[in-house]
From Swiss-Prot:
InterPro entries: AB_hydrolase_fold (IPR029058), TEII (IPR012223), Thioesterase (IPR001031). It catalyses: (9Z)-octadecenoyl-[ACP] + H2O = (9Z)-octadecenoate + holo-[ACP] + H(+). The active site is at residues 90, 226. One of its GO terms (biological process) is fatty acid biosynthetic process. This is S-acyl fatty acid synthase thioesterase, medium chain. Keywords: Fatty acid biosynthesis, Fatty acid metabolism, Hydrolase, Lipid biosynthesis, Lipid metabolism. Its EC number is 3.1.2.14. It comes from the Eukaryota. It comes from Anas platyrhynchos (Mallard).
Length: 251
């Protein structure tokens, strides 16, 4: 489990698990600090995909099915023992959705809450822009990464780091487009769902996520760009909001 799931704090007496999914090209580093930031009733786990961090010598996943199966194998026992919630940012939202579908279809499990951050809903017209990423030149991709934020500027000045970042980003995009997004079922879930986005980002399309559940839904626009969650005040809001949602759920 340790290579797939980062979980510095075990918290055996916690009442609920929060599984966090990083963005495309990302790693565990941002969400690791959430492991300590949440109250003792919540134990945080962060997904670590192959091809990065301590798994940088492993081959990248071939498709979403491989990603979902690996995460399921690592987490299933834990998820069967305690209620769980999912938080994904950008690409991580899509991975968390695919995992949620798999868990419900194959194991009859459903999260108490799904939190989607900085991502287009799969039913939105903007989602299909993701399929055009392979056509974008590396120089333009680097400009986009710089504009979106989330990556220290000094990293983008390092040729070796940028080369690896671009490869991870492209590999994650390859995984994303292998999923049958045309078959996304409306009202498939009954849990509550919340979407978050940065107010400076255009064309969110996050309203399309609302269609996947019959539970209560909310959308929040927080100050900032795609990586609004890195702003300390926004991060504090997210932690408090997620905690409140979990505390108010049927756990």
């Amino acid at each position: 489990m340790d290579k797939v799931i980062a979980r510095p704090y075990k918290r055996p007496n916690a009442l609920c698990r929060l599984i966090c999914f990083p963005w495309a090209g990302g790693n565990c580093s941002f969400f690791i600090r959430w492991c300590e930031a949440f109250s003792s009733i919540i134990v945080v786990s962060v997904i670590r995909l192959a091809g990065r961090e301590c798994r940088d010598t492993e081959p990248f996943p071939e498709d979403m099915a491989e990603v979902v199966n690996e995460i399921t194998n690592a987490l299933l026992k834990d998820l069967q023992e305690k209620p769980f919630a999912l938080f994904g940012h950008s690409f991580g939202s899509f991975v968390s959705y695919a995992l949620a579908v798999h868990l419900k279809e194959k194991h009859g499990l459903e999260p108490v809450h799904m939190f989607f951050s900085g991502s287009y809903g799969p039913h939105s017209e903007y989602f299909h822009l993701m399929y055009k990423l392979p056509e974008v030149e590396d120089s333009r991709l680097l400009e986009l990464i710089h504009t979106l934020g989330g990556t220290p500027p000094e990293f983008l000045q390092n040729e070796q780091i940028t080369k690896h970042l671009l490869r991870v980003l492209k590999e994650d995009q390859k995984v994303l487009v292998t999923y049958p997004w045309h078959d996304v079922r409306k009202k498939y879930f009954s849990c509550d769902l919340t979407c978050f986005n940065g107010s400076d980002e255009k064309n969110h399309g996050s309203e399309a996520w609302i269609a996947i559940t019959s539970g209560d839904t909310s959308i929040y626009s927080l100050p900032g760009n795609h990586f609004y969650l890195m702003e300390p005040s926004n991060e504090t809001f997210l932690i408090k909001y997620i905690t409140k949602c979990i505390e108010n759920s049927d756990i």
